[in-house]
Amino acid sequence: MVNNEYQQLNTLVESDDEADLVIANLVKQLNELKQILVSLDNQEASATAVTDKKEEEYNQNQSSFHNFSKETLQKQAKRGFLLLERCSLVGLQQLELEYVNLLGRSFDSYQQKTELLNNLKELVDEHFSDTEKIINTLEKIFDVIGGSEYTPVLNSFFNKLLSDPDPIQREIGLRQFIITLRQRFKKLSQKIDSSLKQIETEAKIATEQVQNSEVMFGPPDIANDHELNLNWPDSETDAILSSMENELEAALLAKHQEEPPLIVTPPSLIKPTVSQPEVEVVTPTNNTNFQPQVDLKPTDLKKQQKKKPLNFITRPVFKSNLPPKLSKDDIVHYAHQLLEKNTHNE
């Protein structure tokens, strides 16, 4: 039955309703322990108020725990440890889980994340303070009981040594449990502090980057200025670009001055013909079965053009948008050809 309670209390809850029930139960048990502590403190105060008694009587009554029997103290020790295990350890697990969830969430601003981490750190500090009160009470009880000899048997879900038959092993397990619990609280607090410092550094870097980008690309801050001064001095980059632009303009101007003017002449109507190679066949005189050997000799282009005029007019191909300028002889020659063609057709 006890183990089932441990398993239920120490299982990480997933819904908010379950979390509220567990937290309410833990708070109830913690309040019960606080009432025990208050009653013990009152008895201790009444015992320490007696200062006029002898030193021996004062030493016997300096701790109110001596007024209880060992069986009662063992019972209260068990109860205190159960509260320590259920309230402190399970609550610590919830705080650790909440810290992991905060790291994985996205926030609208650094300020929002910082506020949540600060709130979590306050909860950790308060929970650790309550845990220390429980631990101090247990230490006082065990000091009065007599140490390991009267260490109660505790069915712990987290440390099996607390249920060991050997009382010395039970005391070792209890001290290990307390040391581990304190270390986990301190480690979680250190993690939160480290995250807060990291967020502060990231926010500072982001602010510096925004300021640098405003200096490089944005306009100057004129919130406090009445007039905008547009005559800002050129930067080094602007000076380099201006120098390059002047050099290019000077080079283009020098190039235009050196080049001669371009003269455009109208194209001729008759395209020059390409000379064809002359075929010369060489035949042997003695042998009748022979294969002709063709000797190709290119003729002179000028001689080929002087042999005879062309008997037809090719359609001119113009390489410009200007219309051709025909001479009078060309027009007369073209008219004669049209007459001959019409006569031939008739």
Swiss-Prot record:
It comes from Mycoplasma genitalium (strain ATCC 33530 / DSM 19775 / NCTC 10195 / G37) (Mycoplasmoides genitalium). Pfam families: MG491_central (PF22373). The lineage of its organism: Bacteria, Bacillati, Mycoplasmatota, Mycoplasmoidales, Mycoplasmoidaceae. It comes from the Bacteria. This is Uncharacterized protein MG218.1. InterPro entries: MG491_central.
